[in-house]
Amino acid sequence: QGLIAFPRV
């Protein structure tokens, strides 16, 4: 499980 919940778009 990574820390990135919302990838930068």
UniProtKB/Swiss-Prot annotation:
Pfam families: Periviscerokin (PF08259). Keywords: Amidation, Neuropeptide, Pyrrolidone carboxylic acid, Secreted. It comes from the Eukaryota. The modification Valine amide is found at residue 9. It is found in: Secreted. Disulfide bonds: none annotated. The modification Pyrrolidone carboxylic acid is found at residue 1. Its main location: secreted. GO terms for cellular component: extracellular region. One of its GO terms (biological process) is neuropeptide signaling pathway. Mediates visceral muscle contractile activity (myotropic activity). Belongs to the periviscerokinin family. This is Periviscerokinin-1.
